[in-house]
Amino acid sequence: MQCVAQVLWKSDVAKIGSWSDSLGVMPTMTSISSLESLTDRVIGGERITPKEALELYHLPLEELGALANHRRMLARTDAVDGKGNEIVTYIIDRNINYTNICNVYCKFCAFYRTEKEADSYVITLEEMDQKLDELTAVGGIQVLLQGGHHPKLGIDWYLDLLSHMREKYPHVNIHGFSPPEFNHFAEVFKMPLEEVIRRFKEAGLGSIPGGGGEILVDSVRNRIAPLKANSDQWLKVMEIAHGLGLNSSATMMFGHVETVEDRIEHLGRLRRQQDETGGFTAFICWTFQPENTKLRAEPVGSAEYLRMQALSRVFLDNFTNVQSSWVTQGPKIGQVALRYGANDFGSVMMEENVVSKAGANFRLESQEIENLIREAGYTPRRRNNWYELVD
């Protein structure tokens, strides 16, 4: 007798075909899992506890992937007029880093510079216009705007930048400024956090990325980024932003000094926040990229990435969208991830400066993304930040 997860996996194999088999990531069938009652509850759509998540983490990868794929289907059943499980979405945007000057010196970051370094910079309006002209020329509709914690830029610099972008490029959503940046702004501007976020929104900010989350466990954060916003501060920014009508994404960067239990605690904090505010549009996880950083850690492989993405999809039962991280894993693993809980292929990513400095250098055009999605058995569709179809 086979457990239900194995039966689901057999069905997935038939749908996937040979495209992932050639990558060596589709394992052989395993013996009956001792966690059948738990997996049956997962299939039934029940919420799992952190302890149960740890048990599921140790399932054979193909069984966990089958459960994640099933939970993806449950989450997407009513999306896009009932066609949510027939499509995979993506967006055309550009990641623009307005400055690389930063005074928090995260050990996992290869991007930051001090003010005195020759290659430090602060973007000009002319440079921003050039980048946005290039973005709109290829059909781009969003800019991911983030930067270092610059110790001297005042609020007027940011508000002028946002106002300029909104007035000149009104159809481009500004998906900008991570929670640690907002925490930094409140300190530098000497203003209440809510006032800062409100003024940024009034100037043109449309949504907030989930960057800077890393692992929302302070014992971990104190080791990898002791000068950065702590876990409660990160979540507070999101709580305020959601209350002001700004949606955001949520992220996890793993594979450094944290434990599996830390990862699950991180997911638990995101789930509780989503229960309270409902403001997260999607979850994205990726693995630590160690090249050129001060943090020494053995890189985790693609199997571990797929395992954590699958577990995240099962655990985060109140998130509709999970994004594949092809930027760090490569196009083929990004494709396989579509059967491990992901329903979105992320962004064409015209420009990316942070993880590329740490060793991830994958690039894709929109046609390549669409081909990968079709090969996986889905229909590609373009979306905006709110997961509304735009094609």
Protein language model features and the residues they cover:
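Conserved Radical SAM active-site core
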Residues: 25, 113-251, 256-265, 269-272
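Glycine-rich, proline-tolerant flexible connector loops at the mouths of alpha/beta enzymes
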Residues: 94, 146-155, 218, 291-292, ...
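N-terminal pre-triad scaffold of radical SAM enzymes
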Residues: 65-116, 120-146
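Conserved, mostly hydrophobic/aromatic
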Residues: 45, 68, 106, 145, ...
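Hydrophobic faces of well-ordered beta-strands that scaffold small-molecule active sites
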Residues: 88-94, 143, 174-177, 208-210, ...
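Auxiliary Fe-S-binding modules of radical SAM enzymes
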Residues: 2-62, 130, 136, 267, ...
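Helix C-cap/helix->beta junction micro-motif
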Residues: 71, 75, 168-172, 244, ...
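Conserved short loop/turn motifs at secondary-structure junctions
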Residues: 53-57, 94-95, 147-151, 254-257, ...
